[in-house]
């Protein structure tokens, strides 16, 4: 592989965060309630879709095609002022510190926390020209578990979790989470540095609920994961580079990162991506507008601009993640032709394997289990 082709992906920097950030009750949702009455009133007021200032943008690094930014700035005569986070906990910390952004991109469970904490503006889909291509084409997002009727969000990307591996070193796998225990890969296996993903993998392997917070279940999950430790090279969310540079023979991986890797691989046939028959977690990122956004009208224009099919196609090819906008499916299918299991299907959504927020006791139990797994 060409070393100069390597670069970090959107997920490369994701980390599990501290236990304190993850044990917050569903009611508080990890966010300090907005104390400014003006912000609370604004959150209830419909957004007037018009330019009302530059766009203050807060997202993962390198997760929108730069030419899309350029086109938006030229069309609307505004600047995109970018800031980046490297975890959802980092995003939450900035919001709790009072920083003001026009557009953010939380994952599903964090969108639920934000909305429950009164931290998001409502989004009137009727004011978005591109909304029908999303909500009319993807019924799941018309009323997702994390945001009833998508009142505060518009879906940005979706993806699932599986196993990436090097065929040139391991040959074919069996289509099971058991493959992470493959003796041929011992010492060259990574799992994601992500609490929910790793505990979830162990739970699915055992036939347990994906986000179980039951102490007995988690004890079994912990025992299973401890048996994996001799096979591990480490915990890392940089699946893309670990496979490309030969640091890993096998890794737990997000489908979007595997799709992005294909664009850099000299020979895609060297690699494989599988979804385990025991189940594949599905997740999504969302567009959301904070309650204290200084320029919500510009944010609405940006969401609508991003929903244009030509911009969706550019971004799919740039980041490797599918975007649920009708008419763009062929773009992603062509991108992942060597890895068809990267596609997120209707059956994947129906399987209901989502990382949901638990109650305080369950989240604390999961934190403790994760700490134990990481400690070895």
Give names to the regions the model predicted:
Residues 1-9, 19-26:
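N-terminal secretory signal peptides
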Residues 179-194, 206:
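Short loop->beta-strand "edge-of-pocket" segments that line small-molecule binding or catalytic clefts
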Residues 290-350:
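Mature extracytoplasmic/periplasmic domains
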Residues 31, 40-113:
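Early extracytoplasmic/lumenal segment of secretory-pathway proteins
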Residues 96, 100-106, 121-162, 188:
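A structural signal for short loop-to-beta-strand junctions that line the ligand-binding cleft
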Residues 346-376:
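Conserved C-terminal helix/tail region of periplasmic/extracytoplasmic solute-binding proteins
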Residues 121-132, 268-281, 290-293:
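Short beta-strand->loop
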Residues 112, 190-194, 198, 202, ...:
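Ligand-binding pocket segment of bilobal, Venus flytrap-like solute-binding proteins
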């Amino acid at each position: 592989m060409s070393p100069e082709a390597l670069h970090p992906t959107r997920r490369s920097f994701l980390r599990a965060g501290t236990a304190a950030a993850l044990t917050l009750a569903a009611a508080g949702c990890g966010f300090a309630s907005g104390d400014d009455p003006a912000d609370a009133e604004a959150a209830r007021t419909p957004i007037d879709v018009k330019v009302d200032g530059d766009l203050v943008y807060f997202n993962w690094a390198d997760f929108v095609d730069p030419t899309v930014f350029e086109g938006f700035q030229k069309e609307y005569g505004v600047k995109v002022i970018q800031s980046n986070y490297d975890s959802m906990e980092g995003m939450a910390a900035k919001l709790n510190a009072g920083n003001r952004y026009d557009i953010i991109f939380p994952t599903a469970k964090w969108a639920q926390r934000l909305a429950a904490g009164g931290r998001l503006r409502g989004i009137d889909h009727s004011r978005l020209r591109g909304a029908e291509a999303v909500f009319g084409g993807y019924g799941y997002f018309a009323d997702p578990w994390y945001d009833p009727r998508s009142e505060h969000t518009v879906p940005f990307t979706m993806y699932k979790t599986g196993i990436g591996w090097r065929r040139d070193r391991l040959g074919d796998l069996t289509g099971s989470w058991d493959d992470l225990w493959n003796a041929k890969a011992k010492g060259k296996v990574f799992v994601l540095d992500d609490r929910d993903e790793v505990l979830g993998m162990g739970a699915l392997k055992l036939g347990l609920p994906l986000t179980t917070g039951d102490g007995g279940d988690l004890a079994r999950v912990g025992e299973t994961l401890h048996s994996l430790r001799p096979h591990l090279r480490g915990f890392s969310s940089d699946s893309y580079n670990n496979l490309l540079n030969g640091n890993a023979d096998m890794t737990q991986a997000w489908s979007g990162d595997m799709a992005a890797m294909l664009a850099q691989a000299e020979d895609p046939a060297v690699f494989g991506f599988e979804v385990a028959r025991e189940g594949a977690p599905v997740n999504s990122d969302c567009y959301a507008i904070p309650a204290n956004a200084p320029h919500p009208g510009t944010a609405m224009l940006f969401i609508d601009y991003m929903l244009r099919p030509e911009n969706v196609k550019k971004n799919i090819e740039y980041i490797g993640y599918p975007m649920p906008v009708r008419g763009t499916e062929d773009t992603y299918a062509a991108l992942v032709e060597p890895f068809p299991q990267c596609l997120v299907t209707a059956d994947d959504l129906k399987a209901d394997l989502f990382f949901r927020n638990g109650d305080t006791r369950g989240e604390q139990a999961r934190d403790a289990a994760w700490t134990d797994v990481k400690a070895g």
